[in-house]
A protein has these predicted regions:
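Glycine-/small-residue-biased sites that favor an extended, beta-strand-like backbone
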Residues: 4-153
Length: 154
């Protein structure tokens, strides 16, 4: 086996190994990105819980102030217009909480979808590296055959 053959084989092996490492690295990067995105989804859900708690706190203050103002005016708190205002406020509060939950769920679902795509992108990178490795094997083999055309390979 001549020096050219040894060089060709050596370079083919080096290229094959490098392609494998690049594929694994790219897959690892995308898997890490997926974990970051998944954690962001969890944070969005936790933020929604916090936002609802803060909203409830603010709503209770406003509700209390409204009851005090109504009582000071001499109106009966649990009847008539005051009752309907309180009922309307309670309805709006529930609507606002549902809106906070909905928006957080949509944002978290979007992050999870991005995470899924990152994993898929990593798998594609790994598959592309494997295909490149196969191409390297084929090219190296073809080069060796071309170089040794007409001579006996021992």
């Amino acid at each position: 086996m001549g020096a050219a053959n040894i060089f060709t084989i050596g370079m083919g092996v080096a290229q094959y190994n490098a392609q494998g490492k690049i594929g694994k690295y790219n897959q690892g990067v995308n898997n890490r990105n997926a974990k970051v995105l998944e954690n962001q989804a969890i944070q969005l859900e936790q933020k929604a819980e916090f936002d609802i708690a803060q909203f409830n706190k603010s709503f209770k203050k406003i509700e209390g102030s409204t009851k005090v103002a109504t009582a000071k005016s001499g109106a009966v708190v649990d009847s008539g217009s005051a009752y309907y205002v309180a009922l309307s406020n309670a309805y709006e509060a529930e609507l606002q909480k549902k809106l906070i939950e909905y928006n957080a769920k949509i944002a978290a679902d979007n992050k999870r979808e991005e995470a899924t795509f990152a994993i898929i992108k990593g798998q594609i990178a790994r598959n592309q590296a494997s295909l490149a490795q196969l191409q390297t094997i084929a090219t190296t083999g073809s080069s060796l055959l071309t170089m040794n055309k007409g001579s006996k390979i021992a």
